C-alpha cells in the first residue's frame, strides 16, 4: 500500500527516468528549425565536425543533442521518416546501455539509428545484432542509406560470407549481423594463427534487436565449433531397434523437467534386450566400462519418449531438422548435442551423422558480456527485467507508445478437450471472417498448425499455395469485393522461405494467417497490407515510366482503402490456440495487433489437454468444471482462470531463470579460463618472438622432472636416477649420464638442476643454429599455438565430463559448484604443465626441411559450427555447418623432421587440426590412453605424450 501511495506522489522509477529525458528531447526539437535550413552537404559535414569535437576532449554525452537532431533530419530527407519524441527517448535509453521496451510497430529499427550513429562517431565500431539474416540485410540496406548520407560506412555479416568480406564489414563504422555469426566469428578468430587473419576488431558497443529472444530464450544455447569424431552409427541403430520393445513400466517421463529415466525393472529389461541384440556389455550394464552404452540408451529413450516429430523437429530431404520452440522456425544446420540428434536420426531411419568433438565454445551470456557497452530493443522485456538486471546488468525502460494502444485483450476461453477447443476456434474464425476482419492465429507447433489447417479445410476453406505466381491475387480480389475469400495462409517451418511476405500481408481485410508461435517476428503487420512489398513485387517487371508510376499509385490507393476496411472490421484479431510457458511469448503474439494506435483484439482458446494446463495441475480445474456442470462445446471464461494461468507461467519462468543462472555459474568458471587462454593466444601471435617464453618453458620442464624423480630433501641414493634419465631423454631429447652424476660425492638437487638446464639450453641452441634463428622463431610460435589449441580442446571435453559428474556429489553433502571450481582450477594447472612439456618435447626434436612437397597445406579434416545446450539434459539445439578448413590452418610450413640422439629422423607434416582424439602418437602407437605413459613420467598416457596426438 505504501509503495502504491509513493508511486502516486513521486511516480514509478520508470516514469522518473522518462521524465529525465524530456529536457534533452526539448533541446533536440529546438534545433530542428535550424537543421531544416542546412543543405545536404552541410548536414553530412556534421559527422566530421562531431569527430573533431570528440578528438578535442568532448564526450559522446556532450554530443547527444546535436547528433540526434542530425540523424532525425537525415532520416526525414533520406527515408521520409521523422523520429517521434518517444523514439528520441528510446535512442537515449540505448545510448545509456539499457533495454528499450517498445511495442510492435513503434519503429525500433529507426530508433536504433540514433544511438548507433552517436556511438559510431567514436570510431570503435558498433554492432547491430538481429535474429536472422533477412532482418540483418533488410536493416543494413534500409538504415544504411541514412548512415551513408552522413558519411558513415556499414557492413553486413551473414552466413556464407568469406573472411575477407567479414574483415571489411567489421572494419566499417556500423556492422549488422546475426547473433550466431558474431559469436562464431569470435570463436573462429581465436583459432587463427596470425593476427592479420582475424576479422573482428573488438567489442565496444552492441545493440541487440529482439534482445529477449537472444539473451533469454537462447541463453542456454552455447555456440560450439566442433570437429568430427568416431562413427558410432551402428551402435545408435542397434539401440534404437530395442526401444519400441520397452514396456510402459520400464521408464518414467517427467515433462516438467524434460527428462526420462529407466526404472529398476527397465534397467534389467534393457540389459537383456541389448545382449540379445548383440551389444557387448562387460559385466553389469552400469559398470564403468559400459558408460558409453548407458549414455546412448538414455539419449535413445529421450528421442523416443520426449521428442515429437513435427513439434520438436521435422524430417526433410532425409535429414532431421530442429524446430525452434520459440519461433516455430526450422533451424537447418542446427543439431542437438550429446548424441541426441544421432538418436533422433536412428529413430527416423535416416542416415546417422557422426558425433562431433568440441574445439571451441561460448554461451551467448558470456559472449555479450564481452562488450564494453550493451543495449537492446524488444516489445516484451518487463517480465524478464530481473534476469536482465542480474545477468547482464541491463535496466529495462518501458518507452510509451506514440499513440494510445487501442487493442482489446479478452479473457481466455477454456474447454475440456482439444477437439472442443479446435471447433470453437474454427467457429470464431468463421465469425470474424464473415465481417472481413484480418486474423493471425498463433499455434505452438507445426503439428498444431496443420491440425487447424485440416479443420479449416473441412469447413470449406482453401490453403493458399505460395508456390503459385501472384498467390495472393484472389485474396486482394475478395478484399475489393468485400466478400470472404475462404482462403487461409499457413506459416510454419515448412514454409519459412515465404515468412516475411506471408506476415506482411496478414493485415489485408479477410486474411487468415496461421503461424507457429512468433514466426515472422521483426516484420510489421500493417492493416491493409505492406505497400512497399506489394509495389516491389507487382512492379518488378515494369520499366520506370508512366505505366510503373500509375501502377504504383493504384497499389498505394488500394492499400489505403484496404486499411480503412480492416479498421472498420475491428483491426487485426489475434487468436492464440495455446498458452506458452512464458508470458513474454504470449505478450509478443498479442502485441502484433494494435500497432500505432490501430484497433485490434486478442483472445486465447485453451483446453485442459494443453501442455501448460496438463503439466501444471489441470486435474483440479477439470474436477471443478465437472462440478459446475460444464457441457460439451461450452467454455468457461473468467478472469480468475487468467490469474491462475499467469501464476503457473510465473513458476515456469522462475524455474527457467534458476536453470539459466545455475548454468551461468558453471560456465563462468570455464569463461574465466577461456579469457586467459584467448588473451595469451593473442599475445603470442602479437609478439615477434617467443624465445623468452620457450626458455621459461624449458626451465619449467626441468623443474618438473626434478620434482617428479627427486624427493624433497632426499639423499642421492633415494633418487629415481634412471627414471630421471628416461624423462630427460623423452622431454628434452638429450641422453645424459644422470645415473653416474647421482653417484658423485656431494652432489645436490640444485647441482642436478643446474647441469640439466645447461645441457638442455646448449642442445636447443645448437638446434637453433642448425635451423636458423628466423625459421626457429616462426616454428616455435606455430608449435606453441598448435599445442595450446589441442590441449584446450581436450580441456573442454574434460570440463564437460567433470560437470556431469560433480552433480552427484551433492548427495554427499558437498557443494557441486565448489567442487567443480576446485577441480577445474587443478585441471587448468595441469593444462599449463602439459603445454610446457608438449612444446618443449616437440621443439627439442624439430628439424626443418626447406622444400615443402607440392600441394602440402598441412591441414586435413573439416570443422563444424555448433550451438547447443549446456549439459545433455536440457536437449537444446546446436548449430552445425561445414567450415572452410583453410580459415583455421596456419600459414604453409615445410614439414617438420623430428630426430633423436641416435641420428634417426622422421618427417612429420603439420598435425591435422581435427584429428580423432584416439589417434596414436609416434612410437607409442599401442599404448592405451589410460595406461602409464612409457616416458616414465608417472602420468597416464592421455595426459602426457598422448596429449600430442
UniProtKB/Swiss-Prot annotation:
Keyword tags: ATP-binding, Cell inner membrane, Cell membrane, Cytoplasm, Membrane, Metal-binding, Nucleotide-binding, Protein transport, Translocase, Translocation, Transport, Zinc
Membrane topology label: Peripheral membrane protein
Protein localization: Cell inner membrane; Cytoplasm
Cofactor binding summary note: May bind 1 zinc ion per subunit.
EC numbers, comma separated: 7.4.2.8
GO MF annotation terms: ATP binding; metal ion binding; protein-exporting ATPase activity
Gene Ontology annotations for the cellular component aspect, listed alphabetically: cell envelope Sec protein transport complex; cytosol; plasma membrane
Residues that hold ATP according to the record: 87, 105-109, 524
Main location: membrane
Residues that hold Zn(2+) according to the record: 933, 935, 944-945
EC category name: translocase
Pfam family, one: SecA_DEAD
Family matches, as InterPro entries: Helicase_ATP-bd, P-loop_NTPase, SEC_C_motif, SecA, SecA_CS, SecA_DEAD, SecA_motor_DEAD, SecA_preprotein_X-link_dom
Keyword Transport: yes
GO biological process: intracellular protein transmembrane transport; protein import; protein targeting; protein transport by the Sec complex
Family annotation (NCBIfam families): PRK12904.1, secA
Subunit structure: Monomer and homodimer. Part of the essential Sec protein translocation apparatus which comprises SecA, SecYEG and auxiliary proteins SecDF-YajC and YidC.
Function: Part of the Sec protein translocase complex. Interacts with the SecYEG preprotein conducting channel. Has a central role in coupling the hydrolysis of ATP to the transfer of proteins into and across the cell membrane, serving both as a receptor for the preprotein-SecB complex and as an ATP-driven molecular motor driving the stepwise translocation of polypeptide chains across the membrane.
Family of this protein: Belongs to the SecA family.
Name listed for the protein in its UniProt record: Protein translocase subunit SecA
Organism of this sequence: Methylocella silvestris (strain DSM 15510 / CIP 108128 / LMG 27833 / NCIMB 13906 / BL2)
Phylogenetic lineage: Bacteria, Pseudomonadati, Pseudomonadota, Alphaproteobacteria, Hyphomicrobiales
Gene that specifies this protein: secA
